[in-house]
Amino acid sequence: MTDVTGAPADVLHTLFHSDQGGHEQVVLCQDRASGLKAVIALHSTALGPALGGTRFYPYANEAEAVADALNLARGMSYKNAMAGLEHGGGKAVIIGDPEQIKSEELLLAYGRFVASLGGRYVTACDVGTYVADMDVVARECRWTTGRSPENGGAGDSSVLTSFGVYQGMRAAAQHLWGDPTLRDRTVGIAGVGKVGHHLVEHLLAEGAHVVVTDVRKDVVRSLTERHPSVVAVADTDALIRVENLDIYAPCALGGALNDETVPVLTAKVVCGAANNQLAHPGVEKDLADRGILYAPDYVVNAGGVIQVADELHGFDFDRCKAKAAKIYDTTLAIFARAKEDGIPPAAAADRIAEQRMAEARARR
């Protein structure tokens, strides 16, 4: 871990007592003129420069921000490894309410901090930051992706994210039912924002039956008007209890799989775009005990990170789609490893990712 001499005591406590992941570097950033306070955490650069987004969030204190950055950076190492990218994992968090303090001056200052790492960290969008923000950051830092097409970027990544989740569903169907086709399968989608909407399109094109819910009723109404065959239910609680549900796709908030939802879930497969779907590590065992196949979220939702990584080399949609299509094979390999080792799929994915990172370190 990097030297953080002079950091507040609560931050030091978080760094040295909460970091069990062997992070390589943590940078505390402050620019008084713009009001910037940020944390950049690099978990691993074994496979290449750390890649991960910038989260802009009103954390209660610096220690909470550091803890989130450490956790998110570690997650990106595993995601990037399983996506087959030549990138390690990193994450940055900017402390504060973006609605209150986000400014061009602050984003430019942040870009200078990222640039000071000399390419060890490549940033992108995350919660609270958008394509337009990355355009500003890129004015001070060439190690920025997730930019607008007008500024050399690829733009919205929801198309490839949904395509990757769709490939994960096909892999689950192949593993469980011996056939990757989703025709006549019933798929329930919780959250039909940009990613969920595109996922609906893929499923309908293949002849699946689709059931949806979203807290934004106007979004659901627009979707069902456009696709009358789509069935809407009141809420997620109703969705997970739908009779004869084959696949459940959490595509909204994290923690969708928990002690309350798993016991009543009727689906045989869980495969969705939401991050951090498992509320706690014991949930996956609960799923397995009920005979429910779980496709690890960070594997199947990797289409977005595949896109932003490709942007660094001059974005090509067809090349990205071909890479995202490999999520099918990767997911099948995870299920096979899980069966071979007698462990849940998420644990199998972690083992494969750790093996790839260890092999990369050994080659150095």
Swiss-Prot record:
GO terms for cellular component: cytoplasm. Coiled coil: none annotated. Its EC number is 1.4.1.23. The active site is at K91. It holds the Pfam family ELFV_dehydrog. Keywords: Branched-chain amino acid catabolism, Cytoplasm, NAD, Oxidoreductase. It is found in: Cytoplasm. Pathway: Amino-acid degradation; L-valine degradation. NAD(+) binds at G191, V192, G193, K194, V195, G196, H197. GO terms for biological process: valine catabolic process. The keyword Metal-binding does not apply. Inhibited by pyridoxal 5'-phosphate (PLP). SUPFAM superfamilies: Aminoacid dehydrogenase-like, N-terminal domain, NAD(P)-binding Rossmann-fold domains. Gene3D superfamilies: Leucine Dehydrogenase, chain A, domain 1 (3.40.50.10860), NAD(P)-binding Rossmann-like Domain (3.40.50.720). One of its GO terms (molecular function) is valine dehydrogenase (NAD+) activity. It is an enzyme of class 1 (oxidoreductase). It catalyses: L-valine + NAD(+) + H2O = 3-methyl-2-oxobutanoate + NH4(+) + NADH + H(+). Homodimer. Oxidative deamination of branched-chain amino acids. Oxidizes L-valine and L-alpha-aminobutyric acid efficiently, and L-alanine and L-isoleucine less efficiently. D-valine and L-glutamate were not substrates for the enzyme. The catabolism of valine is the major source of fatty acid precursors for macrolide biosynthesis and a vital source of antibiotic precursors. Belongs to the Glu/Leu/Phe/Val dehydrogenases family. This is Valine dehydrogenase. It comes from Streptomyces albus (strain ATCC 21838 / DSM 41398 / FERM P-419 / JCM 4703 / NBRC 107858). The lineage of its organism: Bacteria, Bacillati, Actinomycetota, Actinomycetes, Kitasatosporales. The gene is vdh.
